[in-house]
């Protein structure tokens, strides 16, 4: 059976001799955060899946797989900084050598003082995320129960607003919140589906 060993690394130089002798410090949200959950799924599990035995473990023992692939260190290098992304940004500004885990909108809003991290040589910018090239990003799915349309007041109007150009178009107000709009062809497809109340089965 494959075995895991304890991680004794305190500095980046401990990880790789070519890296600087800088203390490892990662500021991020607690387990209750959706951002933390997304990071665990996309980044941490993404790394796990590069090891065949861990990938196989997911099928054999999901509980152990999750314990291995979603656990963060509790001996100092990972610091839970709460669910306030602004606080993480402030701490990164104070310590440029630290890394942070937070939403894309905060990166854009503070691009004058912090920068995104490359993942496999790809920078987290608008185009790379829109094209699915940045691995630590994911699509947002918006589901509506068709039976609720006409029953729950405002549901139809909310659906139209959420899928409107002014909300999620290229210059929509939701882009200011960190959402990356779909390419024109896909946007048109889902906007039409929302207007016609096309079911998920029919859409696929």
Model-derived segments and spans:
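Flexible loop/hinge segments at secondary-structure junctions
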Residues: 1-204
């Amino acid at each position: 059976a494959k075995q895991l060993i304890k991680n004794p690394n305190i500095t980046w130089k401990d990880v790789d001799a070519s890296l600087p002798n800088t203390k490892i410090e990662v500021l991020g949200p607690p387990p209750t955060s959706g951002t933390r959950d997304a990071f665990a799924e996309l980044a941490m599990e993404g790394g796990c899946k590069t090891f065949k035995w861990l990938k196989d473990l997911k099928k054999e023992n999901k509980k152990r797989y999750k314990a291995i692939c979603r656990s963060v260190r509790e001996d100092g290098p990972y610091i839970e900084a709460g669910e306030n992304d602004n606080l993480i940004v402030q701490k990164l500004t104070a310590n440029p050598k630290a890394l942070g885990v937070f939403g894309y909108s905060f990166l854009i809003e503070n691009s004058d003082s912090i920068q995104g991290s490359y993942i496999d040589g790809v920078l987290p910018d608008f185009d790379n995320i829109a094209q699915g090239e940045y691995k630590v990003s994911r699509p947002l799915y918006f589901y509506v129960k068709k039976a609720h349309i006409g029953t729950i007041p405002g549901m139809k109007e909310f659906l139209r607003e959420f899928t409107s150009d002014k909300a999620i178009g290229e210059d929509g107000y939701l882009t200011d919140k960190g959402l990356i709009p779909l390419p024109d062809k896909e946007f048109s497809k889902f906007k039409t589906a929302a207007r016609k109340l096309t079911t998920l089965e029919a859409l696929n």
